[in-house]
């Protein structure tokens, strides 16, 4: 697996997905983020087994398909610490991911992607559409619970 992406395209979706992870995970894999590259799309998935968040970013340029998990907190901290206009390259080498940007180099331990829990998609026969204001009102009325 290999891909290159601008920090500005990565940081916001990465922060949103990392929000699914709580404090201390019960299983080591739950502290990781699933990175999957296929068809010039990077998908990032995080879960705590109750909630799963997925964010997708279109990749420009060369990439190699694949999937792996990386420590979410360390990965986010590395990306946050890089300058806004950075170009970040990720290369899977054995059981480690090399994160490179300019003269900076980081190496992160990985866990296999097939160890990452898969919350299955489900389809409902019932569909509900709400406006943003209606949803907000409903949440505010039940927020005390």
From Swiss-Prot:
GO molecular function: 3'-5' exonuclease activity; DNA binding; DNA-directed DNA polymerase activity
InterPro entries hit by this protein: DNA_clamp_sf (IPR046938), DNA_polIII_beta (IPR001001), DNA_polIII_beta_N (IPR022634)
Disulfide pattern: none
A UniProt-annotated Pfam family: DNA_pol3_beta
Entry keywords, A to Z: Cytoplasm, DNA replication, DNA-binding, DNA-directed DNA polymerase, Nucleotidyltransferase, Transferase
Location within or outside the cell: Cytoplasm
KW Transferase (keyword) present: yes
GO terms, biological process: DNA strand elongation involved in DNA replication
Ranges in a coiled coil: none
Source organism, top-level taxon: Bacteria
Primary location recorded for the protein, binned into one broad class: cytoplasm
A GO-annotated cellular component: cytoplasm
Keyword tRNA processing in annotation: no
The protein's role, per its UniProt record: Confers DNA tethering and processivity to DNA polymerases and other proteins. Acts as a clamp, forming a ring around DNA (a reaction catalyzed by the clamp-loading complex) which diffuses in an ATP-independent manner freely and bidirectionally along dsDNA. Initially characterized for its ability to contact the catalytic subunit of DNA polymerase III (Pol III), a complex, multichain enzyme responsible for most of the replicative synthesis in bacteria; Pol III exhibits 3'-5' exonuclease proofreading activity.
Family, as annotated: Belongs to the beta sliding clamp family.
Subunit structure, as described in the record: Forms a ring-shaped head-to-tail homodimer around DNA which binds and tethers DNA polymerases and other proteins to the DNA. The DNA replisome complex has a single clamp-loading complex (3 tau and 1 each of delta, delta', psi and chi subunits) which binds 3 Pol III cores (1 core on the leading strand and 2 on the lagging strand) each with a beta sliding clamp dimer. Additional proteins in the replisome are other copies of gamma, psi and chi, Ssb, DNA helicase and RNA primase.
Protein name in UniProt: Beta sliding clamp
Species the sequence originates in: Vibrio harveyi (Beneckea harveyi)
Gene that encodes the chain: dnaN
